[in-house]
């Protein structure tokens, strides 16, 4: 994880091209005035049929489905883990050693919401959630 940690602020984005549409931490609700949400990751909108990509080399430790969020893949980088959610097709299996920028899976396209394709991305150090925006290059 030393290499991962040394690359803070310089990791490639988990998509080829995208824009952050949901920020980390406590955010005001877009519609409901007195409601806040506490995001444990970031939401990145990208082009339909885009792939999620590993931000650093590591080992695939989990892949599973979450109701309402399609599939999730977790990659371990020593003491760190990256989480990629809202995937449909998964290209990797548990135990795979993958490289930075390697495609992990196809991001879900929401046909009922203007064909939006949004990846939910998290970074963890052990059990402590990190702000992914502090890790990816600007």
Can you name each region flagged by the protein language model?
Residues 1-62, 67-70, 76, 83, ...:
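Extracytoplasmic/periplasmic cell wall- or extracellular glycan-interacting regions that localize
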Residues 65, 89, 109-112:
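Short, conserved catalytic or interaction motifs in soluble domains
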Residues 63, 80-97, 101:
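Short histidine-centered loop motifs in beta-beta connectors
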Residues 44, 72-73, 99-112:
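Short hydrophobic beta/alpha edge segments that flank linear recognition/processing sites
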Residues 20, 58-60, 95-107:
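A structural signal for short beta-strand/turn segments enriched in small hydrophobics and glycine
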């Amino acid at each position: 994880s030393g290499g991962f940690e040394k690359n803070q602020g310089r990791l490639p984005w988990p998509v080829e091209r995208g824009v952050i549409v949901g920020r980390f931490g406590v955010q005001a609700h877009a519609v409901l005035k007195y409601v806040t949400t506490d995001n444990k990751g970031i939401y990145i909108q990208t082009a339909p049929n885009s792939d999620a990509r590993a931000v650093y080399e590591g080992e695939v430790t989990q892949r599973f489905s979450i109701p309402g969020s399609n599939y999730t893949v977790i990659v371990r980088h020593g003491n760190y883990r990256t989480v990629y959610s809202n995937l449909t097709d998964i290209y990797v299996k548990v135990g795979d050693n993958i490289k930075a920028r390697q495609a992990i899976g196809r991001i879900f396209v929401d046909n009922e919401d203007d064909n939006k394709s949004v990846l939910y991305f998290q970074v963890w150090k052990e059990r402590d959630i990190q702000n992914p925006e502090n890790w990816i290059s600007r």
